[in-house]
UniProtKB/Swiss-Prot annotation:
Residue stretches spanning the membrane: 136-156
Identification of the protein by name: PAT complex subunit CCDC47
Membrane topology of the entry: Single-pass type I membrane protein
Pfam family of the protein (one): CCDC47
Species per Swiss-Prot/TrEMBL record: Canis lupus familiaris
UniProt keyword Signal present: yes
Length: 483
């Protein structure tokens, strides 16, 4: 039934194609010519179907009123396909189905698709590798902190510079009227007055003055807060501190008597007594109140002897200390000033440190850290106090009893020092003797002449015997004295 239906379809298609062919001819000669080469044309079409593109033919039918577009080359292919399909269907219908032929076919996996196509893998990109602002929050914080540090450095450095210049402009006239040289930087062999501050770093400025009677010179050090350091600025928010002005006057030896004296806040004096060599040795008592002399409760006194306190606390000095107590940290006069205590890992030093007759002043700048250039004018009276103290130290002299007491105190300190360092000095002397013996023995061993070497050994032996005899004689004398 299927075969007959397919055959009818083929006949209908073939008839429509042949009818369209005859419609294309205009005269009978063309029809005759077409009849002669009818099958030849189909042969040419089958041979050229691979290389030539097919032509489209439009046919119209009156009964169905439909327009169809057919390819000439496809007609034969469709006909052949129908015939092949008929024959294949006939073969499949005639042949029986063999179950054993497809045994195990469903069990084999289809590997052709996996061989031809690579497997698709989806990679999860970490969050920190994605291009978003959230991935750079650490870098943003670092850059922000760096910019804040740089801005604070510039602002803090400029503010310290303005404060230093404001202080110098305020005190310049007073300094130039009392000192011949103001502002020597020490770069030239000859002392020259530069008339400006010497910047040590971003928060410390120095000024050297000299050329005045009774003193070798005066070093002024402006110690400002580390405003250029952001961490220091944050720390000061928790614990406010003040800028300071430290003045060190080195007196001539003949223009200052022998005494140690200090006045200042109780907290500052306790700290200085622990740190400074002279205050710890000559002022061993606790700081005493200055209410007896009319000083405020915030100030205390350390003195080697009462005579020094009576002589230094005159009316003008008390006036300075009373009216500017909030700006005074400490005032320290000493003929035995050697700086802070020397701390050595191997013990006490073998000799007393060098001392200088010195006046030390430490003043607090108003503002408790929030200082402005106009606040520097409030420190000008304190510089007048320094000038007055220089003249006062030159005029003040101890009486005979005070002088003897001061000398005893210095002898006592020296004796205590020698006792503390006696063992160390003995060890140092023993090491020097051993080093000398070692050098002598090496000199004898390096001698090439045997006779000369023998004489050197005999001389060394005689020296040792003489030293031993002297030591025995001293021991006998000590025993005789003891009897």
């Amino acid at each position: 039934m299927k075969a007959s239906l397919a055959f009818c379809v083929v006949l209908l298609v073939f008839g429509s194609v042949s009818e369209a062919k005859f419609d294309d001819f205009e005269d009978e000669e063309d029809i005759v010519e077409y009849d002669d080469n009818d099958f030849a044309e189909f042969e040419d079409v089958t041979e050229d179907s691979v290389t030539e593109s097919p032509q489209r033919v439009i046919t119209t039918e009156d009964d169905e009123d439909e327009t169809t577009v057919e390819l000439e080359g496809q007609d034969e292919n469709q006909e052949g396909d129908f015939e092949d399909a008929d024959t294949q269907e006939g073969d499949t219908e005639s042949e029986p189905y063999d179950d054993e032929e497809f045994e195990g076919y469903e069990d084999k996996p289809d590997t052709s698709s996996s061989k031809n196509k690579d497997p698709i893998t989806i990679v999860d990109v970490p969050a920190h590798l994605q291009n978003s602002w959230e991935s750079y929050y650490l870098e943003i914080l670092m850059v922000t902190g760096l910019l804040a540090y740089i801005m604070n450095y510039i602002i803090g450095k400029n503010k310290n510079s303005r404060l230093a210049q404001a202080w110098f402009n305020t005190h310049r006239e007073l300094l130039e009227s009392n000192f011949t040289l103001v502002g020597d930087d020490g770069t030239n062999k000859e002392a020259t007055s530069t008339g400006k501050l010497n910047q040590e770093n971003e928060h410390i400025y120095n000024l050297w003055c000299s050329g005045r009677v009774c003193c070798e010179g005066m070093l002024i050090q402006l110690r400002f807060l580390k405003r250029q350091d952001l961490l220091n600025v944050l720390a000061r928010m928790m614990r406010p501190v003040s800028d300071q002005v430290q003045i060190k006057v080195t007196m001539n030896d003949e223009d200052m008597d022998t005494y140690v004296f200090a006045v200042g806040t109780r907290k500052a004096l306790v700290r200085l007594q622990k740190e400074m060599q002279d205050l710890s040795e000559f002022c061993s008592d606790k700081p005493k109140s200055g209410a007896k002399y009319g000083l405020p409760d915030s100030l205390a006194i350390l003195s080697e002897m009462g005579e020094v306190t009576e002589g230094m606390m005159d009316t003008k000095m008390v006036h300075f200390l009373t009216h500017y107590a909030d700006k005074i940290e400490s005032v320290h006069f000493s003929d035995q000033f050697s700086g802070p205590k020397i701390m050595q890992e191997e013990g006490q030093p073998l000799k007393l440190p060098d001392t200088k007759r010195t006046l030390l002043f430490t003043f607090n700048v108003p503002g408790s850290g929030n200082t402005y250039p106009k606040d520097m004018e409030a420190l000008l009276p304190l510089m007048n106090m320094v000038i007055y103290s220089i003249d006062k130290a030159k005029k003040f002299r101890l009486n005979r009893e005070g002088k003897q007491k001061a000398d005893k105190n210095r002898a006592r300190v020296e004796e205590n020092f020698l006792k503390l360092t006696h063992v160390q000095r003995q060890e140092a002397a023993q090491s020097r003797r051993e080093e000398k013996k070692r050098a002598e023995k090496e000199r004898i061993m390096n001698e090439e002449d045997p006779e000369k070497q023998r004489r050197l050994e005999e001389a060394a032996l005689r020296r040792e015997q003489k030293k031993l005899e002297k030591k025995q004689m001293k021991m006998k004398q000590i025993k005789v004295k003891a009897m």
